[in-house]
């Protein structure tokens, strides 16, 4: 919906960006089950630059608790191993030729609680990002109303719409967090 020079769909898009970033961050949290998304945040020093692991290797899940990383270029194996170790995912690479195998250890109760805390931190960062977008939208509405580009009634109605979008997005963040928390705590 667009009124004057205010487009609420742009705010929705920016808020959805925060939830997509949260999904990406939560996907990188280890839950005790192998998932190729665990390695998405891993950056490899390759050819003089930082590259995502998925640009230098193929990641597969041959078993529920095993990741297999097929490195395309033999000269990159050591760099990929180092990137995995440096990523603080708690994984120990075992190399056989051009294949790096990563056993996913069982999570103990203490580690599960730590991961839940990290997930909560990610979710709070997403909520803060959503609130910043809301504040930007409300500030824009106030400026438009002050400059007489929209009426006071329109400003209040649109502010209410912005709040509804904010509430829905924060609810989505909370649902993503609850699902990840359940996944982490399930033994």
From Swiss-Prot:
Q: Which organism is this protein's natural source? A: Rhodopseudomonas palustris (strain BisA53)
Q: Which HAMAP family match?
A: RRF (MF_00040)
Q: Name one GO cellular component term.
A: cytosol
The entry's function note states: Responsible for the release of ribosomes from messenger RNA at the termination of protein biosynthesis. May increase the efficiency of translation by recycling ribosomes from one round of translation to another.
Organism lineage string: Bacteria, Pseudomonadati, Pseudomonadota, Alphaproteobacteria, Hyphomicrobiales
Q: Which domain of life is it from?
A: Bacteria
Q: Does the keyword Cytoplasm apply?
A: yes
Record NCBIfam families: frr
Key word Protein biosynthesis present in the record?
yes
* GO biological processes: cytoplasmic translational termination
Q: Which SUPFAM superfamilies match?
A: Ribosome recycling factor, RRF
- Example GO molecular function term? ribosomal large subunit binding
- Identify the Pfam families for this entry: RRF (PF01765)
The protein's matches in InterPro entries, at most eight in alphabetical order, are given as: Ribosome_recyc_fac, Ribosome_recyc_fac_dom, RRF_sf
Q: Where is the signal peptide?
A: none
* Record's protein name: Ribosome-recycling factor
Annotated compartments? Cytoplasm
Q: Which family does it belong to?
A: Belongs to the RRF family.
Principal localization? cytoplasm
List the keywords (alphabetical): Cytoplasm, Protein biosynthesis
């Amino acid at each position: 919906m667009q009124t004057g020079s205010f487009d609420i769909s742009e705010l929705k898009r920016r808020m959805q960006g925060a939830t997509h970033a949260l999904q990406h961050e939560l996907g990188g949290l280890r839950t005790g089950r192998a998932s190729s998304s665990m390695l998405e945040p891993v950056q490899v020093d390759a050819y003089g630059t930082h590259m995502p692991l998925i640009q230098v290797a193929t990641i597969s899940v041959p078993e529920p608790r095993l990741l297999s990383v097929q490195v395309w270029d033999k000269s990159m194996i050591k760099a990929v191993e180092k990137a995995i170790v440096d990523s603080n995912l708690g994984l120990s690479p075992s190399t056989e030729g051009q294949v790096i195998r990563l056993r996913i250890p069982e999570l103990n109760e203490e580690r599960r609680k730590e991961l839940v805390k990290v997930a909560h931190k990610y979710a709070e960062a997403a909520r803060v990002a959503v609130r910043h977008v809301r504040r930007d939208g409300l500030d824009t509405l106030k400026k438009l109303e002050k400059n007489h580009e929209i009426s006071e009634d329109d400003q209040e109605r649109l502010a209410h719409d912005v709040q509804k979008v904010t509430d829905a997005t924060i609810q989505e963040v909370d649902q993503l967090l609850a699902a990840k928390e359940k996944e982490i705590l399930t033994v």
